[in-house]
Amino acid sequence: MNTAVTLLTEQAPQPIEEFGQLERQIIIILDFGSQYSELIARRIRETQVYSEVLSYRTSAEHLRQLNPKGIILSGGPSSVYSDRAPHCDPEIWNLGVPILGVCYGMQLMVNQLGGEVAKADRGEYGKASLHIDDPTDLLTNVEDGTTMWMSHGDSVTKMPPGFEVLAHTDNTPCAAVADHDKKLYGVQFHPEVVHSIGGLALIRNFVYHICECEPTWTTAAFVEEAIREVRAKVGDKRVLLALSGGVDSSTLAFLMHKAIGDQLTCVFIDQGFMRKYEPERLVKLFQEQFHIPVEYVNARDRFLDIMVGVTDPEEKRRRIGHEFIQVFEETSRNLGPFDYLAQGTLYPDVIESADTNVDPQTGERVAVKIKSHHNVGGLPKDLRFKLVEPLRKLFKDEVRKVGRSVGLPEEIVQRQPFPGPGLAIRILGEVTADRLNILRDADLIVRQEINQRGLYNEYWQAFAVLLPIRSVGVMGDQRTYAYPIVLRIVKSEDGMTADWARVPYDVLEAISNRIVNEVKGVNRVVFDITSKPPGTIEWE
């Protein structure tokens, strides 16, 4: 159960102002609504240079104050000649900072600087071969004919003054353009996606050769600075942390404990919807192996009671979230008082919701409402904490690196995503103690068989689902009428899209045989071969 909490917000993304030494060299991405904006930031960070995603509305003056080494304009779904198309502050062209426009960002650059963009005779979507006309500067070490990913219905029809074509495709005469003197560059393709074979080389050229950045954004340096900042902020005050056993909250707990030791209190609320043996193993690991005290709260009966008669998945989430808040409130009052709440806020949370609740006297962010992956409600108004969020600059893959760096074992670092409501939303229909036991046993077999064959890290998620129906079967000479189990095993890079995994038949056979023979109440196993989209990874 992921109980790491994040602020509920509704405003546009704002920059993280409290830059440390690591972020002095920064590449800013202005977001025009692209589904790939976060991916651009991740690709920049993979080059060991810090990056942030800001709204396209960010003023040139604000950007000047941030002093970026470079700016990237993201793609987007609009046409630059549309009346409602988003435009950036035209003064950014006078900042004297290298700028790279990607897809819509390139078209916007061309449009605002005196060129022309129009609807293309033929749109270009998917893979395309890039023919390089100028192999220097931005396209250094990018092979001629390399594959790049296109997704556009508009094209540049007239170049702005001072620009020249760097590359073209069979359908796009201006696939890459540049004004070398002003260090303004544009590409019609998406170098950030994995399908663009030469994309990373292009990004590295922009970051290192054009923006002249240095590789300062490293895991070791981040950990050192985060510990220093936590100590400076918290001082000798007490900090409360909600532990779930997932990689985010576990990494947070390790980092906080390294920084402040026994000033940290970890609370694990067992709501009864975790996988078999997980609660006991988690508490034992933290207390005996990691020597981090954990306050264990057994709330299984309370959560099971509120599930009686509930079949709607959203109602399940609402009730679980509400009850979690009640238990969390009671526990914090019993163990308190606390000055700070340690949150596992990650950078995507900051991008999606950048509103802040600020204490007018101290200027610090305070937790008035919290949000978890099971959509919990707000904390009571009189239960106010100041926030400490050492992971809020990180993407998920960076959290895993930090986890390894601070000593988190690989079994937690590589733990597959698990929904906040846990098994409650992998049981379709009403959640009962009997159904929970059936699903726990079946799910354990799935994980055991996958693990034994060294396949665990091959899949984004691998789990069992219990359906609220029964089917006829035969075992021995007896007719059976029992539940079916669904196997859901998928591959994905980020969970936004997913493909059903081509699991070897012998593995599927072993899982099926064990479940129907070892799990009482199950007589059939089926395999879900639906990708996302159109389906979702979870069934509820």
From Swiss-Prot:
This is GMP synthase [glutamine-hydrolyzing]. The keyword Oxidoreductase does not apply. The keyword ATP-binding applies. It comes from the Bacteria. Keywords: ATP-binding, Glutamine amidotransferase, GMP biosynthesis, Ligase, Nucleotide-binding, Purine biosynthesis. GO terms for cellular component: cytosol. The lineage of its organism: Bacteria, Bacillati, Cyanobacteriota, Cyanophyceae, Nostocales. Residues 26-216 form the Glutamine amidotransferase type-1 domain. It comes from Trichormus variabilis (strain ATCC 29413 / PCC 7937). ATP binds at S244, G245, G246, V247, D248, S249, S250. The active site is at C103 (nucleophile), H190, E192. It catalyses: XMP + L-glutamine + ATP + H2O = GMP + L-glutamate + AMP + diphosphate + 2 H(+). InterPro entries: Class_I_gatase-like (IPR029062), GATASE (IPR017926), GMP_synth_C (IPR001674), GMP_synth_GATase (IPR004739), GMP_synthase (IPR022955), GMPS_ATP_PPase_dom (IPR025777), NAD/GMP_synthase (IPR022310), Rossmann-like_a/b/a_fold (IPR014729). Its EC number is 6.3.5.2. Residues 217-415 form the GMPS ATP-PPase domain. Pathway: Purine metabolism; GMP biosynthesis; GMP from XMP (L-Gln route): step 1/1. Catalyzes the synthesis of GMP from XMP. CDD domains: GATase1_GMP_Synthase, GMP_synthase_C. Homodimer. GO terms for molecular function: ATP binding; GMP synthase activity.
